[in-house]
């Protein structure tokens, strides 16, 4: 017993001695760190020798001696020593033992300290086991149990030892004993009770596995799977979904549908469908409007119940609605084989088609408008039960009177080749207009406006309530027998098809390469403007209809071999020739009502002389818009002016500046070219 008592007392003294040494070392290290920090802050480590102070780049040279990963606050010999960092354990003696393991004396002290501490802890375990297993047992039995447990824990000691860095020579497995000393803090306070005096290593390993808390990885995966299940229920897939249009009781507009197949249900506006094959649903009982479709083969609704608008198709094979009960507006179709609506009970608007073989519809019981066709093989309507009148007008300013339920006036036509109309029982007139100024046709029951017709060859209507006008090289068309309100828009280079069997008012607006119109019916229909067009406002009300022409002053659309038209807001100079025209390439944006894109004339634009040769803006005169060729030219890049020398003039007094020689002066003031007299006048205003 005395031997055991000495064992318990001796480690206490060594423990206190080692603790004092560890505390002293920590204080010394702390002071050294402070010294090094101050050493770096005052840059004294750079100025080592007087000769080094003379070199202004010495600090940079010193820094280049070190690698980027080196710690500058340590000594060179300390940098090369690998340090083992263990974040799992934080006791003072363990850190001191690992950091100072090169010192044999300190290592020996740490080993003796750990061995004595281990003996003390084992004596504590032994006393616990004595009280539990053999309360009345002898010391020899306790000793045997202690030896058995020590030998039994040897496999665990090897297992724990693998967690540490490899020990240096002379290191007597103190790290594993240190870890066993800390096991009561990690494990439950009472060690597991062995089932036999000598327990097997497998049983101890099994107990260790049971004592250790569960791994955090399993818990994390369980939480992640639970979160994934919860989130997967609240996540909606909104990508790559085919959209369908909603139904509403009032007008809706759908803009810019590209490469899509859409269907419209009620009161919807479909704007500018590009490269699409749309099918519009039928069964509409109220007014519909079909808007311009571009590069499309469109089929419009049948038996519609609400208002629909389908944009005007360009280069389209178009079929319009049949058996409609509401009003419809069909805008002009360019390069289209159009088929118009049949047997509609209320007012409809049908637009002209360009380069189309039209078919005329017969047996109409209501008011209809047929527009003139340009370059068209028209078919005229026959079997007319109402009065018709045939007027031949040659180079005449005629006025045609129509005896319908509402009187109509057809105003001045100038230089006209008339088309004849036959078998008329009542007043109907078909007007052929060539090189005509515009006119407005208004009926008493419903006012009608007839837009300007330019360069038109008319065709006659035969034996039908509807007039079919054939126009060759024509902008305009004539308005025909209608009991109510009708508007007929200008058509240029169009072969339209006209649809009959309407019981109510119909509006047929042909808008091809034209200033297009926006048609608004009694049931609020919107007809969108066509691209490459100047819009004219077309409004259908119960009383009066106004068809406004927004063409340029000459009411003239310049023709291009490539089919391009001049749609600029204003021209920079005189009217373009037929050979060279300015073309504005517009983006494929959805056209809005009254939409017109203003493009500045200073950008490089493409113009076409022939179909196979393009000329850029620099090859064209800025003022006269003719090719520059090999003549003398004036180029001012800052003002983006490139013109003939004969066209170069003072923009104030219009004095030609073509005879300028070396040394002559021109003045540019506020982006405007001034000759010397004009600029001197401006200079005089500055001087008081």
UniProtKB/Swiss-Prot annotation:
<dbReference type="GO" id="GO:0030216">
    <property type="term" value="P:keratinocyte differentiation"/>
</dbReference>
<feature type="modified residue" description="N6-acetyllysine">
    <location>
        <position position="83"/>
    </location>
</feature>
<dbReference type="GO" id="GO:0090263">
    <property type="term" value="P:positive regulation of canonical Wnt signaling pathway"/>
</dbReference>
<dbReference type="GO" id="GO:0046872">
    <property type="term" value="F:metal ion binding"/>
</dbReference>
<feature type="repeat" description="11">
    <location>
        <begin position="447"/>
        <end position="465"/>
    </location>
</feature>
<dbReference type="GO" id="GO:0005737">
    <property type="term" value="C:cytoplasm"/>
</dbReference>
<feature type="repeat" description="8">
    <location>
        <begin position="387"/>
        <end position="406"/>
    </location>
</feature>
<dbReference type="GO" id="GO:0070062">
    <property type="term" value="C:extracellular exosome"/>
</dbReference>
<feature type="domain" description="LIM zinc-binding">
    <location>
        <begin position="619"/>
        <end position="685"/>
    </location>
</feature>
<feature type="repeat" description="16">
    <location>
        <begin position="544"/>
        <end position="563"/>
    </location>
</feature>
<keyword id="KW-0479">Metal-binding</keyword>
<feature type="repeat" description="1">
    <location>
        <begin position="251"/>
        <end position="266"/>
    </location>
</feature>
<dbReference type="GO" id="GO:0001533">
    <property type="term" value="C:cornified envelope"/>
</dbReference>
<keyword id="KW-0472">Membrane</keyword>
<keyword id="KW-0963">Cytoplasm</keyword>
<keyword id="KW-0440">LIM domain</keyword>
<dbReference type="GO" id="GO:0008544">
    <property type="term" value="P:epidermis development"/>
</dbReference>
<feature type="repeat" description="4">
    <location>
        <begin position="307"/>
        <end position="326"/>
    </location>
</feature>
<keyword id="KW-0862">Zinc</keyword>
<feature type="repeat" description="13">
    <location>
        <begin position="485"/>
        <end position="504"/>
    </location>
</feature>
<dbReference type="InterPro" id="IPR001781">
    <property type="entry name" value="Znf_LIM"/>
</dbReference>
<dbReference type="GO" id="GO:0048471">
    <property type="term" value="C:perinuclear region of cytoplasm"/>
</dbReference>
<feature type="compositionally biased region" description="Pro residues">
    <location>
        <begin position="186"/>
        <end position="195"/>
    </location>
</feature>
<feature type="repeat" description="15">
    <location>
        <begin position="524"/>
        <end position="543"/>
    </location>
</feature>
<feature type="repeat" description="9">
    <location>
        <begin position="407"/>
        <end position="426"/>
    </location>
</feature>
<dbReference type="GO" id="GO:0009612">
    <property type="term" value="P:response to mechanical stimulus"/>
</dbReference>
<feature type="modified residue" description="Phosphoserine">
    <location>
        <position position="289"/>
    </location>
</feature>
<feature type="modified residue" description="Phosphoserine">
    <location>
        <position position="389"/>
    </location>
</feature>
<feature type="compositionally biased region" description="Polar residues">
    <location>
        <begin position="1"/>
        <end position="25"/>
    </location>
</feature>
<feature type="region of interest" description="16 X approximate tandem repeats">
    <location>
        <begin position="251"/>
        <end position="563"/>
    </location>
</feature>
<feature type="region of interest" description="Disordered">
    <location>
        <begin position="1"/>
        <end position="29"/>
    </location>
</feature>
<dbReference type="InterPro" id="IPR052621">
    <property type="entry name" value="Cell_Prolif/Cornif_Regul"/>
</dbReference>
<feature type="repeat" description="10">
    <location>
        <begin position="427"/>
        <end position="446"/>
    </location>
</feature>
<feature type="repeat" description="5">
    <location>
        <begin position="327"/>
        <end position="346"/>
    </location>
</feature>
<keyword id="KW-0597">Phosphoprotein</keyword>
<feature type="repeat" description="6">
    <location>
        <begin position="347"/>
        <end position="366"/>
    </location>
</feature>
<protein>
    <recommendedName>
        <fullName>Sciellin</fullName>
    </recommendedName>
</protein>
<feature type="repeat" description="14">
    <location>
        <begin position="505"/>
        <end position="523"/>
    </location>
</feature>
<feature type="repeat" description="3">
    <location>
        <begin position="287"/>
        <end position="306"/>
    </location>
</feature>
<keyword id="KW-0677">Repeat</keyword>
<feature type="compositionally biased region" description="Basic and acidic residues">
    <location>
        <begin position="358"/>
        <end position="373"/>
    </location>
</feature>
<feature type="repeat" description="7">
    <location>
        <begin position="367"/>
        <end position="386"/>
    </location>
</feature>
């Amino acid at each position: 017993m005395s031997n055991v008592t000495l064992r318990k007392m001796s480690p206490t003294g060594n423990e206190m001695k080692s603790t004092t040494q560890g505390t002293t070392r920590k204080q010394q290290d702390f002071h050294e760190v402070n010294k090094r920090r101050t050493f770096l802050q005052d840059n004294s480590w750079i100025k080592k020798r007087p000769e080094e102070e003379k070199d202004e780049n010495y600090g940079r040279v010193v820094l280049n001696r070190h690698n980027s990963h080196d710690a500058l606050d340590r000594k060179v010999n300390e940098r090369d020593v690998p340090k083992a960092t263990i974040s799992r354990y934080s006791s003072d003696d363990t850190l001191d033992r690992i950091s100072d393991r090169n010192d044999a004396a300190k290592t020996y002290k740490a080993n003796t300290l750990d061995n004595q501490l281990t003996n003390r802890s084992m004596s504590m375990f032994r006393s616990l086991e004595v009280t539990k297993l053999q309360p009345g047992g002898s010391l020899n039995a306790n000793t045997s149990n202690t030896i058995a447990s020590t030998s039994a824990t040897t496999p665990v000691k090897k297992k724990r030892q693998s967690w540490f860095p490899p020990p240096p020579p002379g290191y007597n497995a103190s790290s594993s004993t240190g870890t066993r000393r800390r096991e009561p803090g990690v494990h439950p306070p009472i060690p597991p009770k062995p089932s036999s005096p000598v327990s097997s290593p497998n049983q101890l390993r099994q107990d260790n596995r049971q004592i250790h808390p569960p791994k955090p990885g399993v818990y994390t995966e369980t939480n992640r799977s639970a979160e994934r299940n919860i989130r997967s229920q609240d996540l909606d897939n909104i990508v790559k979904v085919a959209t369908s249009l909603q139904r509403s009781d009032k007008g809706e507009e759908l803009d810019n549908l590209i490469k899509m197949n859409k269907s419209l249900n009620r009161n919807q506006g479909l704007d500018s469908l590009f490269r699409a094959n749309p099918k519009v649903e039928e069964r509409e009982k109220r007014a519909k409007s079909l808007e311009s479709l571009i590069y499309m083969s469109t089929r419009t609704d049948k038996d519609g119940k609400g208002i629909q608008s389908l944009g005007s198709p360009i280069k389209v094979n178009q079929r319009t609605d049949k058996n409609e009960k509401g009003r419809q507006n069909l805008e002009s179709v360019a390069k289209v084989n159009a088929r118009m609506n049949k047997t509609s009970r209320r007012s409809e608007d049908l637009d002209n088609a360009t380069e189309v073989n039209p078919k005329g519809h017969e047996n109409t019981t209501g008011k209809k408008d047929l527009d003139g066709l340009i370059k068209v093989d028209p078919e005229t309507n026959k079997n007319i039960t109402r009065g018709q009148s045939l007027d031949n007008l040659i180079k005449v300013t005629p006025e045609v009177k129509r005896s319908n339920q509402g009187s109509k006036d057809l105003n001045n036509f100038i230089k006209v080749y008339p088309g004849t109309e036959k078998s008329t029982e009542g007043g109907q007139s078909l007007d052929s207009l060539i090189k005509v100024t515009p006119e407005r046709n208004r009926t008493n029951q419903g006012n009608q406006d007839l837009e300007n017709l330019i360069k038109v060859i008319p065709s006659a209507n035969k034996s039908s309530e509807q007039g079919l006008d054939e126009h060759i090289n024509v902008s305009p068309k004539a308005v025909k027998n209608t009991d109510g309100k009708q508007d007929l828009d200008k058509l240029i280079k169009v072969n339209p098809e006209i649809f009959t069997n309407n019981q109510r008012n119909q509006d047929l607006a042909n808008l091809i390469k034209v200033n297009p119109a926006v048609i608004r019916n009694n049931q609020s229909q919107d007809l969108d403007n066509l691209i490459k067009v100047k819009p004219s406002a077309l409004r259908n009300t119960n009383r009066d209809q106004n068809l406004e022409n927004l063409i340029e002053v000459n009411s003239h659309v310049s023709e291009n071999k490539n089919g391009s038209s001049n749609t600029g807001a204003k021209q920079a100079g005189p009217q373009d020739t037929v050979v060279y025209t300015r073309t504005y390439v517009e983006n494929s944006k959805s056209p809005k009502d009254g939409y017109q894109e203003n493009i500045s004339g200073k950008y490089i634009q493409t113009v076409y002389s022939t179909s196979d040769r393009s000329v850029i803006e620099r090859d064209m005169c800025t003022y006269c818009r003719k090719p520059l060729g090999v003549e003398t030219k004036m180029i001012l890049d800052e003002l983006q002016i490139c013109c003939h020398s004969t066209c170069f003039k003072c923009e104030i007094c219009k004095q030609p500046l073509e005879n300028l020689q070396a040394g002559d002066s021109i003045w540019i003031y506020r982006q405007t070219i001034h000759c010397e007299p004009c600029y001197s006048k401006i200079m005089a205003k500055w001087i008081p």
